[in-house]
Structure formats: C-alpha cells, structure tokens
From Swiss-Prot:
Cofactor: pyridoxal 5'-phosphate
Name listed for the protein in its UniProt record: Tryptophan synthase beta chain 2
GO MF terms held by the record: L-serine hydro-lyase (adding indole, L-tryptophan-forming) activity; pyridoxal phosphate binding; tryptophan synthase activity
Gene symbol of the encoding locus: trpB2
InterPro entries recorded: Trp_synth_b-like (IPR006316), Trp_synth_b_CS (IPR006653), Trp_synth_beta (IPR006654), Trp_synth_beta/beta-like (IPR023026), TrpB-like_PALP (IPR001926), TrpB-like_PALP_sf (IPR036052)
Amino acid sequence: MRIVVNLKPEEIPKHWYNVLADLPFKLDPPLDPETKQPISPEKLSVIFPMSLIEQEVSEERFIEIPEPVLKEYAVYRPTPLIRATFLEEYLQTPARIYYKYEGVSPTGSHKPNTAIAQAYYNKIEGVKRLVTETGAGQWGSALSYAGAKFGLEVKVFMVKVSYQQKPMRKYMMNLFGGKVTPSPSEETNFGRKILSEDPDNPGSLGIAISEALEVAVSDPNTKYSLGSVLNHVLLHQTVIGLEIKKQLELIGEKPDILLGCHGGGSNFGGTILPFVPDKLSGRDIRFVACEPAACPSLTKGNYDYDFGDTAGLTPLLKMYTLGKDFIPPKIHAGGLRYHGSAPIIARLVKEGLVEAQAFDQDETFEAAKIFAKLEGIIPAPESAHAIAGAIREAKKAKEEGKERVIVFTLSGHGLLDLTAYV
C-alpha cells in the first residue's frame, strides 16, 4: 500500500529558515559592477522592495511568515511526502525512497512558495507592477497567479525556445492576467541588440533577465521579481525542507541522501537548507544537486564573480558560472537553462557540503517515463533530473546492500510539458 505522509493545515511552517545564521562562514557579498565594492541597499531598491532587500542580507535564523502569505500557502500546503514503493519494487533496491510533491500547487510547481511572498511584500510597499523572466514558464505562471492574488500587474519575458515548446504555459500566465513576451524581443534595447546580431537566437534566462531589468529600472511603479538564485528566494522555499523534516519525524525516518534538481537553486535550496545544521553538527547526510549535462554550472562552471544576466545589469554574484554569454542547448528542461547558480548553493558546493551530478537528457527522460508509469505522476522535465538522481542512488544502495533513506523533491508536474515526451 502507498504511504503518504500528510501534515495538518495548522502544521504549515510559520517561519522561513535562514541558513545564513548557521553557516560557519560568510558569503561573499554582491558587488556593484561599477565600483566592484559591496552593493548598497539604495542601489538595489531601484529593482527590489526594501523588505526583500532586508531579507537578502538578514542573518536572523527564523523569519516570520506574514499572515496574508500563510493564508495563500494554505490553498495547497502542506504538500505530501510520498513513499515511492512502486519505484522501489521496480528497482529491487533495499533503499526507501520518498518524494516531496510540490506539483499540487495552483500552478503545478514549487514556484508559488516565493511568488506569493514576493507579491505580498511588493504590494505593501505600493508597487503596481512586477516584471520578470521565465524559462519553462513555471515561474512566470506562479508570479502571474500571485500578482492576481495581490492585485499586481505582471509582465513576463519568456525564453523564446520554451515559449515555442510550451504554448500552454503562456495560456496559463494569460489566464492569471500575466502579459507574456518571447525573449529576446523587440520591446527592449537589449532584446533588439541580440536580435540584430542573431535573429534566430533561442534565448536564455540571462537574456530574459536583462530585458526584465531594463523594464524595471525605467518605471518607478515597477519592480523586478526573480524566481531563483537570490538568498530571499531560497529563504521562502525552505517551507519545503521544513515540512519534509516534520513528515520524516512522523514516520521515524532520517534521510541519508537529499536530492533536488538544480538550475538556479531555489527548489534544491528549499529542500536541503533546513537540514544543513544537521550536517554541520556531524550527521552523515548527503546533499546531491542534479543538473542537466547541457547546462552544467555546478559540475563544470568556474567559481567566480559574474553577472546574473547577459547584459551585465545585475550586481556581480559569487557563484559557479558558465559565463553570462553562455547560451545553453535547446533542452526541454527550460527551467534549468541558467548559466549561474545561487551563491548559497555555490558556496556549499565549494566547501564540500553539497555534491553536484550532471544528467543527460536521455537518462533524465528515461527516469521520468519509468516514474510516470509506476508512480502515476508525469514529472516536469526539470524535476525529472531529481528522479534520475534518486534512481542512481537507489541502484548504488542495491549494489552495496545498504538500506538507505533517499528523499527528493518532485518540484512540479509535467502536464503542460507533454511535447517533451514525444
């Protein structure tokens, strides 16, 4: 019988967990690209509301989740932790495999966890419109939904190759009131520059971020919203890992391995960060970031300061990067086609606290198809990387005869990504 671990509605975490309070080292600060000195909050306030800037630099261990955000979380949280018994039987592994399913959210992924929070903080500071980028459309859909909830206009630049591959995402964003433009576009100076140099450019998250930032800085009523990478985004996503902790405690399990797909780091960070203090205190637990071999920022990138976008408009961030001009191949996992990585995750990799593994598209989709047939959930192409990672680890446990507890986050469903499976 399938084991599903559900928490009660009142058990939704009331605070986000801030790992910066517990790390034995300080992160390198974001730098002003003009002065190469730590960037001032005043400069960041052009694109972000001050409350999110404060969260970005906070070292407070727990940050209270505002009541209006909790009210919206309660629409779909807590999310279930499910034991993958059919997958275990198929693999004939002694490992116990659990997955945290974030696809039950209104837009089908983990992205509303931060979209709702960001929309709320922008709303209370008087912002009228949010502008953002999106790869596969999961983030754009989540922000469009959150904008509708809090009465904000939302403008989305969607990476062109994903815009063409995933038309249903555009329809979902439109349904929630979001206005979507394929990127690179004719709507911004940077977009026009890219198209003049390469009319067939497939786009990238770096380019789409540049276009969104250009719009944000030109309108005082508009702020920029980012779906991954930054500290405050990972902070909001820790509701995932905090719930996993409670759910595992309910059934008397302790994880040996935690996995998540990795593009910018929000889903992976949200999964593992609440467990980092356990590892720092000596517990034997592995964190595995699963990224596409076609965009291997953690496994093949350089650890250095780089821009978060292609035009060089963002602060310089210390991270693993393939270079701001890197244009990834047209893989189906559009949400993972990012040249950089979250500074928090990058530093954890650098310190040896997090492992990174790369997966090619064939292995990833083979894992996704097996999972769909056995567990009854069609995973998003991005999320399928975590499944591939879990299968690798389960096979290794079988070879070694170890009863390991493997936990991964299934960050979203793939019902709007079905063309990827053809």
